[in-house]
Amino acid sequence: MQHCPARAARQLAAAALALVLLLALAAPRAHAALQEKHGIRLLTFDHSQILSIGNQTSGKCSWYALRYARTILDGRVCSGSGMWSNGAVWSAGGYTGYSGDLSACLHTIYNELSAGRPVIVHLKNTTVSGVNKHTNRTSTYEYHLSGSGWTQVNYPHIATSDTYGHWVCVVGIRADADPANLKESDFYALDPARVSANGTLALTRLLDGTIWTANSPLKIAG
């Protein structure tokens, strides 16, 4: 049989192209774009995937926050397999620690979100004035998504241990936030304690004074 080098080369090139396309489709996404949704610039993600993970079980906020982050980055539900050992195994989820003062942390969160990557943030309680109960807390308001926009709900009683703190997955920022003058309250998170409010996606707005800068404040992708 006579061989045709040109035909063989074309077949090889076609096979190589098919393999590249297959690998590209199978590879996880590296980022998710920020898009404005009713006044909040929010990373794009499938809300149903986050809701399928649901709210945390006791003591596992770090693991749930990591699962939310990986789900957003990969575009598929993260089971969290291999990512828990008496606390989230950050490296198993492709996250690493970042430390700095408050200004550095806020700008890092802003830059990571702008690059399409969720940030996992370590919170401590702060004292809130003008309330009748639960004066020490990590959050005050949450926002429920409906067809007409976000509904603000006063849900004040999320508080945390002074020893361990609380982990959330930051996924959004106020549309009118000033990059030169950032505040904690500019940012919105998927809070493992309340990511699902009876099946409705809920975002929690960070409270000023809650990022635990002295104790492993951020986990970032990469």
Walk through the language-model features, giving the residues of each.
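Bacterial N-terminal signal peptides that target proteins for export
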Residues: 2-16
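Bacterial N-terminal signal peptides
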Residues: 15-24
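Active-site-adjacent structural segments surrounding the nucleophilic cysteine of cysteine proteases
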Residues: 26-92, 147-160, 182-184, 197, ...
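Well-ordered beta-strand positions in beta-sheet-rich domains
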Residues: 29, 167, 200-203
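Solvent-exposed, acidic/flexible segments
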Residues: 54-63, 99-102, 106, 112, ...
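Substrate-binding cleft of extracellular glycoside hydrolase catalytic domains
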Residues: 82-108, 113
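Active-site-adjacent substructure of cysteine-protease-like catalytic cores
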Residues: 104-190
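Active-site or metal-binding loop neighborhoods of secreted/extracellular toxin and effector enzymes
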Residues: 173-222
